[in-house]
Each structure stands twice: as C-alpha cells, then as structure tokens.
C-alpha cells in the first residue's frame, strides 16, 4: 500500500499544472494619466510555441460570462501565448470607451514584452464590444492616443461586431453611439493597414439581420490599403453572440440599425464556435 501511495504521489507530481496564471496589466488613458492595472489571464503555449501572442477581448456582457476561456485554451494549444483581459466583470460595470481602448493598448504592450513572444507578431481578437476595440486597433488614432510608439498589432480578428455602428464611425458620424462616446469623430478616418478579419453574424439583430452590413462597412473605409486587407466572412443563419453558450434575448435601446431599438436574439451555435476558431487560426497562421 505504501508503494502504491508513493507511486501515485510521484505520478501526480510530474503532471504539469494548468499553464495559466492571473497577471496584472498596466494601462494609461493618456500620457499624463496615472498608470493603473487590470487583471488578466495569461496562458502559456501547450503545443509547439510559435512566438505569437494573442490578446482576447470579451464582449459587453462582461468577463464573468466566461466566453474568452474557450479561445484562450484553444489558441494556447496551437502554440500561442494568450492574454484574456478582465476589462469588467458585469455589463453594469462597463468603463467608458476611452478606458476600454487603453486596456487594449495595455494588452499589446504587455504581450510584446514577454520572453518567447515576437513583439511584431502580437495579434488581437474580440467579440462584440471586444470586436469594436479590435477594429479600432487598426486606426492611427489608437496608436497616437495611447502612445503605441512603433508597436502595432500584427493581425486583428473581430467576431460579430455590430457593423452599422462601424460604418457610422467610418463615415465620421459616431455621435450618439454609446461604444464611441468621448472619442473624436475622426477616430476611424486614418488607418494603419493592419490585416483585419471580420466574422459576421448573418442574422445579427443589431444589424437588422442584414448579412451585407459588414461588407458595407468595408466599402466605407476611406483608406484603400486598409480596405484591401480587411476581409469579411459571413456566418449565415447565425446570431450575434453565437459563442455565449446559451440562448437568450433582451431589449436594446438605441443600439440597432440607425440608432433604433430592437430585441437582440442570441442563439448558441457550437458549429459556429468551431468554425470561428478555425477561421481565426488560419488567418493568424497565414503569411
């Protein structure tokens, strides 16, 4: 019995612990502001390391809904160092847009300094609200406002962004749109030419179930190079929040097409989740 216990102890001792840790990420809303910190989950590569970092930005429901874990685990197994920001826990605690964008820059700077990560190969992906931050991270304003210096995201993947909102911003008309409150009207008028993949929900309630909404956004990008490196993949018959793990609906005030009200319907789709993972992986691995 003693030998059995000893063998079990030895076996357990060589099983690696989960390759994740809770870390603190520095951020600042501008060059004169005090440096603050937010929590994040850092995952080390479980597969062959590929020297790439991936920042994962959750949706407006908050980190507590645990949507980012599935992506952190998946991409860590593909050799990425992943960082899931805890931007806020619940929707009612959502910070202002200026702070949210500062979080994204903080994540870029954190990953770029890690040993084993090529600072030129740090990418970002986000869902819904996180997708807005991801798209905005292709703008020149983002790097100027948050002192990015020579740092740039390598690639960007936006999952089910609300594209009528992005189209308004691309036109220089973000007024009255909550995710853009406090941002200059010109914040999406100049671009960095960073490859951007948009995975659009063909039945997104926010976009009036218009499967062409994200294509329309790309057509309104006023920079030829950025438009050329922005690709849209539409998941037909798929709703906003396809990766939330449950079905639900709620009233949206002023956030639907043309600043109108609507009922957002979310239907969980494991098929779309798997398809999305593979699409983003192929995008990030492509030369």
Predicted features and spans:
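C-terminal catalytic histidine-bearing segment of alpha/beta-hydrolase fold enzymes
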Residues: 227-287
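Short beta-strand/loop motif that positions the catalytic acidic residue
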Residues: 198-200
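Short beta-strand-to-loop junctions in surface cap/lid or active-site-entrance loops
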Residues: 39-50, 115, 184-189
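N-terminal cap/lid segment of alpha/beta-hydrolase-fold proteins
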Residues: 20-49
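Short alpha-helix in the alpha/beta-hydrolase fold that links the catalytic acid
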Residues: 208-221
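Catalytic nucleophile-loop/oxyanion-hole region of alpha/beta-hydrolase
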Residues: 87-109, 113, 118
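Primarily recognizes the serine-hydrolase "nucleophile elbow" in alpha/beta-hydrolase
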Residues: 66, 106-193
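Short substrate-entry loop that stabilizes the transition state in hydrolases
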Residues: 48-52, 57-94, 165-166, 205-210
């Amino acid at each position: 019995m003693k030998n059995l216990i000893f063998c079990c102890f030895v076996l357990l001792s060589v099983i690696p612990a989960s390759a994740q840790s809770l870390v603190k990420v520095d951020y600042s809303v501008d060059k004169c502001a005090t440096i603050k910190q937010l929590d994040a989950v850092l995952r080390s590569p479980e597969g062959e390391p590929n020297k790439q970092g991936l920042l994962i930005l959750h949706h407006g429901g908050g980190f507590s809904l645990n949507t980012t874990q599935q992506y952190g685990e998946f991409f860590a197994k593909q050799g990425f160092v992943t960082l899931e920001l805890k931007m806020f826990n619940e929707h009612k605690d959502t910070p202002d847009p200026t702070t949210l964008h500062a979080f994204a820059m903080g994540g870029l700077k954190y990953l770029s300094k890690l040993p084993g990560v090529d600072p030129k190969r740090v990418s970002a992906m986000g869902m819904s609200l996180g997708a807005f931050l991801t798209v905005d991270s292709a703008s020149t304003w983002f790097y100027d406002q948050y002192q990015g210096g020579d740092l740039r995201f390598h690639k960007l993947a936006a999952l089910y962004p609300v594209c009528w909102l992005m189209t308004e911003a691309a036109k220089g008309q973000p007024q009255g749109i909550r995710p853009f409150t406090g941002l200059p009207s010109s914040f999406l008028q100049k671009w960095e030419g960073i490859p951007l993949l948009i995975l659009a929900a063909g039945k997104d309630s926010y976009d009036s179930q218009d499967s062409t909404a994200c294509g329309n956004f790309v057509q309104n990008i006023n920079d030829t190079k950025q438009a050329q490196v922005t690709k849209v993949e539409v998941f037909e018959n798929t709703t906003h929040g396809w990766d939330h793990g449950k079905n639900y609906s709620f009233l949206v005030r002023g956030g639907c097409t043309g600043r109108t009200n609507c009922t957002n319907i979310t239907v969980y789709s494991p098929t779309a989740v798997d398809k999305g993972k593979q699409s983003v992986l192929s995008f990030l691995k492509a030369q």
